[in-house]
Amino acid sequence: MSNKVQMDNDFMQMQKPFALFAKWLEEATVSEINDPNAMALATVDETGLPNVRMVLLKDFSSRGFVFYTNYESCKGQEILKSMKASLVFHWKSLRRQIRIRGIVEKVSTQEADVYFQSRPRGSRIGAWASKQSQPLENRFVLEKAIAQYTARYAVGNIPRPPYWSGFRVKPLSIEFWCDRPFRLHDRLLFTRDSVEQVDWQRQKLYP
């Protein structure tokens, strides 16, 4: 068995999903060229039709996985209706994938304020100027709004829009997947019945 296969296979013995996630994310940060914190976010509309898009993970802990968005956007509205979501991380350079399913909660006002102020000034202006997911007549309309808000907040702090905040996905299941030859991949699934539970059930899955 090669050293790489042996190293990749070691994860199958791990007992704590958040520790394993942290390890894989750290390794992806080194090997992945673009946005190692990018994740696919899946939601469903009121008819059950799924939507998926890429967003960026901005924080994680044993409480869950955090990203930020406009609550009036398509994804924001779909999450607010169901308060459920699924995430997928895929790191091609490592040939690894993580699937997460869980319930969603809003981050606190303090968390949202702190993160919003850490964003580049142009991004904060954009949060005010963009009516995310709404029809846009042409690019000029958006650029005009950007100019207006740039002038309005030319001096001093830019406040966080009331409709712009974050969500935390609190996982009920986390599955780790690692590529192996002949599609005989390694899969390790952690599940729990409630997000209040500290202990996880752990099982290996057939490829």
UniProtKB/Swiss-Prot annotation:
It catalyses: pyridoxamine 5'-phosphate + O2 + H2O = pyridoxal 5'-phosphate + H2O2 + NH4(+); pyridoxine 5'-phosphate + O2 = pyridoxal 5'-phosphate + H2O2. Keywords: Flavoprotein, FMN, Oxidoreductase, Pyridoxine biosynthesis. Pfam families: PNP_phzG_C, PNPOx_N. Substrate binds at K58, Y115, R119, S123, R183, L184, H185. Transmembrane segments: none annotated. It is an enzyme of class 1 (oxidoreductase). It comes from the Bacteria. Its cofactor is FMN. One of its GO terms (molecular function) is FMN binding. SUPFAM superfamilies: FMN-binding split barrel (SSF50475). Pathway: Cofactor metabolism; pyridoxal 5'-phosphate salvage; pyridoxal 5'-phosphate from pyridoxamine 5'-phosphate: step 1/1; Cofactor metabolism; pyridoxal 5'-phosphate salvage; pyridoxal 5'-phosphate from pyridoxine 5'-phosphate: step 1/1. Signal peptide: none annotated. InterPro entries: Pyridox_Oxase, Pyridox_Oxase_CS, Pyridox_Oxase_N, Pyridoxamine_oxidase_dimer_C, Split_barrel_FMN-bd. FMN binds at R53, M54, V55, L56, L57, K58, Y68, T69, K75, Q97, Q132, S133, W177, R187. Binds 1 FMN per subunit. GO terms for biological process: pyridoxine biosynthetic process. Coiled coil: none annotated. Belongs to the pyridoxamine 5'-phosphate oxidase family. PANTHER family: PYRIDOXINE-5'-PHOSPHATE OXIDASE, PYRIDOXINE-5-PHOSPHATE OXIDASE. Homodimer. Catalyzes the oxidation of either pyridoxine 5'-phosphate (PNP) or pyridoxamine 5'-phosphate (PMP) into pyridoxal 5'-phosphate (PLP). This is Pyridoxine/pyridoxamine 5'-phosphate oxidase. It comes from Bartonella quintana (strain Toulouse) (Rochalimaea quintana). The lineage of its organism: Bacteria, Pseudomonadati, Pseudomonadota, Alphaproteobacteria, Hyphomicrobiales.
